[in-house]
């Protein structure tokens, strides 16, 4: 018999995770002719002082929790399956240390977001364990996002989360002390003081979210199948059809289309809303939806004259989803310090995801560079996700 050809097939396989022990040898050298002279290489810096975890292992735990939403107690069970007993408190300590090392990079992201001329903002509850009361209290994560991709703008996409003890409007005012520009938000009343001319940094322009107004009418229609609510949804839908067509155009091009096509639709919508409100019972749910829309009308119309502004704040709402998933699985943060670490690590990981980076590869390299001292504080901008990605691409081209 002789071979006349072959058939080749492929199967996708997996190599399960393997834990290993890295042994670091540091020989000591002595001089027989010198009294008390001993030379030894300095021990490499560790992410956890005197700890047994490598940077790669801590990164794996951090990414598991904040990128893939695996609670730490679940990860301890996974380690047990690999034959390693690790207490949850040990993992907590490692995560806190990772956040400590990454705080300067996080603050750089925060500064970049708040220096932008247009920012999205939203918030979400974050239960935090109060050990004295033996129950949780409801704190907040404020999400600030920049994303100019829908209009080909210059800003790179970034999201940062800032932990606050509650939802008081003062936190937003403190966060935005240096911000001056357009803030795209929902209808939360705590934002209103930001429009005052005498505030530090000057008045902020609030652009409201049309999706929130639409949601008001949708709830009315869902509960009552109101024909007026259905018409409101249809009119708002016309606006979204136009927005879909102009996505990706420049800011100037978007304003041109919005002025010629969207503005007449919304002007007619406002007249229709006022007519409906005059005829509707003041206590009806439809009247409430109409009043909500009219009360926020000026902010809802900002996008007509500014092509950088979106019709809604869905971009920042999408950044809230990873926090919600982690919260659902972990139930709560174990302390205020833990919640702050959650905000730091989620900001860096989710910004990396916006740039289509693998969180494990990116974060392991970044932490290694910071911990080892290879990248100094004044060079942290080199580790920002987009800069790191560009540098990695250049290295791959050079190696090809």
Where are these regions (language model features)?
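Short Cys/His-rich "knuckle" micro-motifs
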Residues: 2-8, 40-44
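Intrinsically disordered, low-complexity peptide-like regions
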Residues: 5, 11, 310-312
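Short Cys/His-rich metal-coordination motifs, predominantly Zn2+-binding knuckles/fingers
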Residues: 1-4, 17, 32-36
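Short Cys/His-rich Zn2+-coordinating modules
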Residues: 7-19
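Catalytic center-proximal scaffold of phosphoryl-transfer enzymes
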Residues: 21-400
């Amino acid at each position: 018999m002789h071979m006349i050809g072959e058939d080749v097939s492929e199967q996708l396989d997996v190599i399960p995770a393997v834990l290993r022990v890295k042994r670091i040898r540091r020989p000591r050298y002595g001089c027989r002719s010198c009294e008390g002279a001993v030379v030894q290489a300095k021990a490499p810096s560790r992410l956890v002082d005197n700890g047994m975890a490598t940077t790669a292992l801590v990164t794996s735990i951090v990414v598991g929790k904040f990128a893939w939403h695996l609670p730490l107690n679940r990860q301890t069970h996974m380690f047990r399956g690999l034959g390693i007993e690790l207490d949850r408190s040990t993992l907590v300590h490692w995560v806190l240390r990772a956040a400590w090392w990454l705080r300067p990079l996080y603050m750089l992201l925060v500064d970049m977001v708040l220096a932008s001329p247009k920012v999205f903002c939203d918030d979400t509850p974050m239960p935090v364990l109060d050990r004295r009361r033996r129950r949780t209290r409801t704190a907040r994560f404020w999400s600030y996002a920049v994303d100019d991709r829908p209009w080909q703008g210059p800003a790179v996409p970034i999201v940062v989360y800032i932990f606050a003890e509650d939802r008081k409007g003062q936190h937003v005012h403190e966060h935005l002390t240096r911000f001056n520009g357009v803030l795209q938000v929902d209808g939360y009343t705590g934002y209103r003081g930001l429009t005052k001319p005498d505030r530090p940094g000057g008045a902020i322009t609030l652009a409201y979210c049309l999706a929130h107004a639409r949601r008001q009418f949708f709830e009315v229609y869902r509960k009552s199948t109101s024909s007026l609510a259905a018409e409101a949804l249809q009119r708002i839908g016309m606006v979204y059809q136009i927005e879909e067509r102009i996505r990706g155009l420049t800011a100037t091009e978007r304003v041109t289309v919005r002025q010629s096509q969207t503005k007449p639709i919304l002007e007619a919508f406002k007249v229709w809303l006022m007519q409906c409100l005059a005829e509707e019972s003041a206590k009806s749910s439809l009247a409430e939806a109409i009043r909500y829309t009219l009360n926020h009308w000026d902010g809802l119309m900002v996008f007509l004259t500014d092509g950088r502004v979106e019709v809604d704040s869905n971009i920042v709402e999408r950044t809230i989803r990873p926090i919600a998933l982690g919260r659902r699985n972990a139930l709560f943060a174990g302390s205020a310090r833990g919640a702050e670490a959650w905000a730091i690590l989620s900001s860096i990981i989710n910004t990396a995801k916006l740039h289509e980076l693998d969180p494990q590869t990116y974060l392991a390299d970044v932490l290694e560079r910071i911990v080892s001292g290879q990248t100094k504080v004044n060079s942290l901008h080199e580790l920002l996700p987009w800069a790191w990605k560009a540098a990695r691409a250049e290295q791959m081209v050079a190696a090809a």
